[in-house]
């Protein structure tokens, strides 16, 4: 077992609706325990700013074109995260060693090795007086990765932790993670006659909830389909769905990470709010 760290992780996904905060204790490999979890919703103003700037950044050059606006929003988001950290630490008697700061993704292109998350790690460290680990996706790209998905490291830890005793010699675990984008992790351990083989394979495979979120925002005053109510009421249009699946052209070998801008909802434009939500 390696050194145990108590870390406060801050994650804001492609739904762009707020920050998930978790305090965990882990050695990063096998030992893991959750100490605190809470969701902090963005205010309407900051959320609209994030949505607006993301829609403006269509190609890498737009990051330069809108640099001033990006910096302003980035500072605002960093202060939001700082307030989250202070509220958590002030209300919970837990001493954390470091903060994990993902930031808010507004652009991701794995082929061009460019990704942008809103969030200033150095400023967050100054505001909270804590060590901050950040630039996860940028560093993954620099080291030959796709910048996404990042969850496989945690999936592998879960497999090692919970399956070691039951399947000591061999296991193959597949974990499907459905966020804005869906990704899958396969973690394998094989140990037979001292022939050891351990590996992790992971990739993005398809859109997850990002299309539903966009559809609901455009067709109603809701931010997303709360509890799947709209989809439950609606009827899936199989013809439109099958045509969309053919046009998406997603399949093996799943070499490139995906971004929500790789997909659009135009194919469902003739459907009602409920039927479109069900189909998407």
Q: For each predicted feature, which ranges?
A:
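Short glycine-rich, Thr/Ser-proximal phosphate-binding strand/loop in the N-terminal lobe
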Residues: 11, 15-68, 197-202
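Gly/Thr-rich phosphate-binding beta-strand-loop-beta motif of the actin/hexokinase/Hsp70
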Residues: 2-35, 171-190
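A glycine- and small-aliphatic-rich helix-loop capping segment at beta-alpha/alpha-beta transitions
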Residues: 23-30, 112-123, 158-160, 188-199, ...
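A contiguous, well-structured pocket-lining segment that forms one wall/lid of small-molecule binding clefts
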Residues: 221-280
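Short beta-strand-loop/turn "lid" adjacent to the catalytic site in phosphate-handling enzymes
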Residues: 61-121
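Glycine-rich phosphate-binding loop of actin/hexokinase-like ATP-binding domains
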Residues: 160-231
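Short glycine/proline- and acidic residue-enriched helix-loop micro-motifs
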Residues: 59-73, 223-230, 273-274
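Glycine-rich phosphate-binding loop and adjoining helix at the ATP-binding site
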Residues: 95-156
